[in-house]
Amino acid sequence: MSKLKISYSDLDSLSKKIYDKVRPNFCPDIVLGIGSGGWLPAKLVNNHFNVEIESIQVSCYNNRELSNIVESNFSKINSNYIINKKILIIDDVNDTGTTLGYVVDKLYNLACGEIELCAAVMHHKDKEKKYDILSDIRTRYEYANLADDVWIDYPWESN
């Protein structure tokens, strides 16, 4: 399988690209990094926004069905904390869409719909998704780069 190798320098450029796409129409109260791949991208994007930052751990395994997602630790991400907030969700890659779909559902339901969401990723894989974030009216969506369906080798990946 071919790989797309990403350097730390690339991540800086990609985070600036996300900021430039998101900022004109959405200024978050909170940047939320989905771990573990979205933690560093969230920090880098938040260097531009300079707002509160939170992180969650969400894992998706096997055939990437929603039922296979390991329940995340939403720590202080509860309805009182997020209601009427603008939250920018950051992850490294949108592969099947399952993780983003889970997080959008969870946040939207916790806030009883009283929330503004924007999700952004470093790479959006150009393939069919289990969850089509582009057609979900509950959230805006941006990505820095469109990628082929190849392995994306981020600096934090073990080889």
Predicted regions and their residues:
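Conserved acidic residues
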Residues: D29, K85, R140
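Active-site-facing substrate-recognition patch
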Residues: M1-P28, N63
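Internal catalytic-core helix/loop-beta-alpha segment
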Residues: Y81-H123
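PRPP-dependent phosphoribosyltransferase catalytic core
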Residues: S2-L4, D105-N159
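Glycine/proline-rich, flexible active-site/cofactor-binding loop segments
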Residues: N25, D29-V58
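Short, well-ordered alpha-helices that flank and scaffold nucleotide-derived cofactor binding pockets
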Residues: D20, K43, N47, D105-N109
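Short, glycine/charge-rich flexible loops or terminal/linker lids adjacent to PRPP-binding catalytic cores
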Residues: S15, N50-I87, T98-V103
